[in-house]
Amino acid sequence: MRIAGRDKLDEFSGAHADARSWIDTWIADAETSIWKTPQEIKNNYASASFLANNIVIFNVKGNRYRLEARIAYNTGIVVVQWVGTHAEYTKRMG
């Protein structure tokens, strides 16, 4: 998969060093994967949540943080839309 919005991940992991290893591993996994269905993501990320419009919420570091991405299964693109703390995510989703 190609990752768009990687700068958001780099910025976040720079500010939250405890998330860096997880994010680096996720990037490596996403870049070497070819996700064609939500189930293929679920197989590796059992706690991932799937929303409308191909939005996937990944729990980072035991749900301390959240990563929101839109998956374009047909083109192989992952668009990182947002990454932040679980508390920030809860506020966003209001």
Residue spans for each PLM region:
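Basic, Lys/Arg-enriched alpha-helical interface segments
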Residues: 1-64, 72-79, 86-94
